[in-house]
């Protein structure tokens, strides 16, 4: 080959090298830009993931809060229903206590009356009928008599007025009822006054 051809080949090689270097330089700028965008995207993704986790935590907290509030409302509703039920049951408590002396007086009148006297018989029948009607009416509202004669003594239901020895009764048994007790819907409003065997 001639010198001239060598020069042309060398020039062509130089131009080709320059073009490759230029392409590499252009590629390098694009790579740098792409890497910067990738880094920015990764940071943005990390921020979004953190925000998502925080939002999920808040949602879970709100759900727990709602569940607690629902449970509290349910408990309050249940307590209110129980209190209303109790108020209905025992609203008559004081009124029933005031009626007990009337029942006692009617029973005393029946016991004191001479059933053999013809003049007293119609009056006695009227008092007995009044007593029966009165007791029936108050029993409809949950008032019940406590008459524990012969039963074991129970301090929740009975009030011991005296204790006596008795060979005919077991120890700690009610021998005699001095005054009947009464309960209203399972709650004692007046304990029975009793004599207990020793």
From Swiss-Prot:
Region of interest (Disordered), residue spans: 1-20
* Superkingdom of the organism of origin: Bacteria
User: What Pfam families does this protein's entry cite?
Assistant: GrpE
Record field: compositional bias (Basic and acidic residues): 1-14
Q: Tell me which SUPFAM superfamilies the record gives.
A: Coiled-coil domain of nucleotide exchange factor GrpE, Head domain of nucleotide exchange factor GrpE
Task: Give one GO term, molecular function aspect.
Answer: unfolded protein binding
Q: How does it assemble?
A: Homodimer.
The record ties this protein, via HAMAP family, to: GrpE
- What is the recorded function of this protein according to its Swiss-Prot or TrEMBL entry? Participates actively in the response to hyperosmotic and heat shock by preventing the aggregation of stress-denatured proteins, in association with DnaK and GrpE. It is the nucleotide exchange factor for DnaK and may function as a thermosensor. Unfolded proteins bind initially to DnaJ; upon interaction with the DnaJ-bound protein, DnaK hydrolyzes its bound ATP, resulting in the formation of a stable complex. GrpE releases ADP from DnaK; ATP binding to DnaK triggers the release of the substrate protein, thus completing the reaction cycle.
Give the family, as the similarity comment puts it: Belongs to the GrpE family.
Please give the name of this protein: Protein GrpE
Q: Which organism is it from?
A: Vibrio vulnificus (strain YJ016)
**Quick one: which gene encodes this?**
grpE
